[in-house]
Amino acid sequence: YQLMDVMKEYRPEHERMLWGLGLAGNAFKKVYYDPQLQRQVSLFVPAEDLVVPYGASDLASAERITHVMRKTENELRRLQVAGFYRDVDLGSPNNTLDEVEKKIAEKLGFKATVDSRYKLMEINVNLDLPGFEDPDGIALPYVITIEKNTQTILAIRRNWNPDDPRKLKRQHFVHYGYIPGFGFYCFGLIHLIGAFARSGTMILRQLVDAGTLANLPGGMKSRGLRIKGDDTP
């Protein structure tokens, strides 16, 4: 009931995740409480929008997990009015697409250089926050949200259960892998058969070119060409 009736986005988001999983080899789901909907939500997060440190082996042991989010001006304002983010003036959105985003836009069939949305960096990190230090000197898990263009901190939230004596971080992300790799990321069909697809495309083009030349009724006749009998080209 919770997944099918209450969380209306669960099925379409999960289908999007499964479609991208086989190709890219990695896909993520984010499960969290949405202050606007006032309920739990489960959203698909593409691999390019989730950044982990080099050398991380899994989400549980990663020292930092950064979720790149994009919010319209109205969406961000609603969250500020709801008290989820600080009510500060960020100016107009000025988000220039990076190379990865431009390539993705090209694959989708359009060309873009700017995005009229705010880019927010939601960072799950262990932090020794001044004024809230742990007596044992241990960095505690927090969720920090920063607007990328202005580097403005919008929110800092505790990411552990207050009743947990060990103060372990709460995990909001689920990693789905297609074929296990040698590190954090897994392999997908693009990695496994991408080279064969390129080779097949090259061979097919060569066959088409050879067939075209063999069946083309034309050629060149030089001035000094010797022709025997009626063998006129």
Predicted segments, located by residue:
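Extended alpha-helical, oligomerization-prone segments that build pores/tubes and scaffolds
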Residues: 1-233
